[in-house]
Amino acid sequence: MKPVALIARLLLGITFLAFGLDFFLHFISSTVPFPGLSNRADDYLSALSRAAYFFPILKALEIIGGLGLLINRYTALFAAGLFPVTLNIFLFDVFLGYQLLPLGVAMILCNAALLYAYRRYYKFLFTVRPAL
């Protein structure tokens, strides 16, 4: 499991770091043409961007999480913390942005592999009656 976790950690870290930085620096989105999104996908992204705070905070968290995964610090925390972001990316790709589905599938698989690899760190969260 160690090689799988290492590859998943590095791929997910690079992906989050690259797309997080791209939001602020525009080095991918200005050079790589992304496939056209459906009207529903455009409406969804437009609605999210109307809240001016949403994308800057999300992308800052992606950068921090990506760096944490890449330098292997607090990996279990970042794997769990980034899972809702990864799940939203995956569901967006499934229901709205079909052309980007391979990226969403790869990200959800990498995040699931990390959650599985670090599962012993989450066991205490599922204690029914924790003792103080």
Task: List each language-model region with its residue ranges.
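Extended, low-polarity transmembrane helix blocks
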Residues: 1-31, 56, 70-132
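Membrane-interface interhelical connector segments
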Residues: 25-48
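Interfacial helix-start motif at the membrane-water boundary
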Residues: 43-60
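N-terminal alpha-helical segment
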Residues: 62-63, 108
